[in-house]
Design a protein with these regions (language model features):
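Alpha-helical scaffold segments that flank or form the walls of functional sites
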Residues: 21-38, 56-62
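Charged catalytic cores and adjacent phosphate/nucleic-acid-binding surfaces used
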Residues: 1-6, 10, 20-21, 83-86, ...
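Structural motif
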Residues: 2-4, 34, 93, 122
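Glycine-rich anion/phosphate-binding loops
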Residues: 15-19
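Extended substrate/RNA-proximal surfaces in nucleic-acid metabolism proteins
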Residues: 41-151, 206-211
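Proline- and acidic/polar-enriched loop/turn elements at helix boundaries
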Residues: 39-40, 73, 155, 186
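Generic enzyme active-site microenvironment
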Residues: 5, 37-38, 71, 123-125, ...
């Protein structure tokens, strides 16, 4: 089974406890095929070029053992720096978080801003079905039209993940939509790594023939 984990934090994040190397080596030992590092943009700040180059070094270092991707988790409460679309042009992808929070930037404003990013973009730990109801939108069409993928966050902190595991109606909607779906552990320290949940989510997506980003 092809296994990805595209949401991990390191010491580049204020709440990360491990080095990128430790996260990557744990992924190798856990049988992960693709590991994504996605530290918080508001912690990295002006050191974004340093962060990017560090992850590029890790890509080369571990190239014969695992595929490493350079991502970034971007907070939306409040609206983040307008320079980020240019600053992340070379990144593999970005994850936007907290759009379903009442303090987040306006969703329509977000969609306009998202179009400035040239790298892949996804929604982290977001109940997209609830978000669609909140704005009265066909959220599936919105994500598809704006080339945004969705994340299944296996950290155990978000109920939408557990609902999707057993909700065949929502599974069918996502499958028929063709929207790519990623899997992310949202790891902040290795003691919390949930390998079994990562494998289960990846297996479900493959059984449903739902594409990865």
């Amino acid at each position: 089974m092809y296994t990805v984990d595209l949401h991990n934090h390191t010491k580049f994040s204020y709440d990360g406890s491990n080095t990128p190397e430790e996260i990557i080596e744990n992924a190798i030992n856990s049988g992960i095929d693709v590991i994504g590092i996605t530290d918080h943009q508001f912690t990295i700040g002006d050191n974004l070029p340093v962060y990017y180059e560090y992850i590029q070094h890790c890509k080369i270092k571990y190239a014969d053992k695992i595929k490493v991707l350079c991502g970034l988790e971007i907070g939306t409460r409040p609206a983040p720096e307008q320079s980020l679309p240019i600053a992340t042009r070379q990144f593999d992808y970005v994850l936007f978080e907290c759009l379903d929070d009442s303090r987040a930037m306006d969703f329509y404003e977000f969609l306009e801003w998202r179009r400035q990013f040239v790298c892949k973009a996804g929604l982290a730990h977001t109940d997209i079905f609830a978000l669609g109801e909140r704005y009265g939108l066909d959220i599936i069409k919105v994500l598809r039209d704006n080339d945004i993928f969705w994340e299944l966050n296996t950290s155990g902190n978000y109920n939408y993940y557990y609902d999707f595991l057993t909700n065949t109606k929502k599974q069918r909607i996502i499958k028929e939509s063709g929207i790519p779906v990623s899997v992310g552990s949202d790891t902040h320290y290795l003691a919390e790594y949930r390998k079994k949940q990562i494998r289960r989510a990846n297996q479900l997506l493959q059984e449903l023939n739902i594409p990865l980003p």
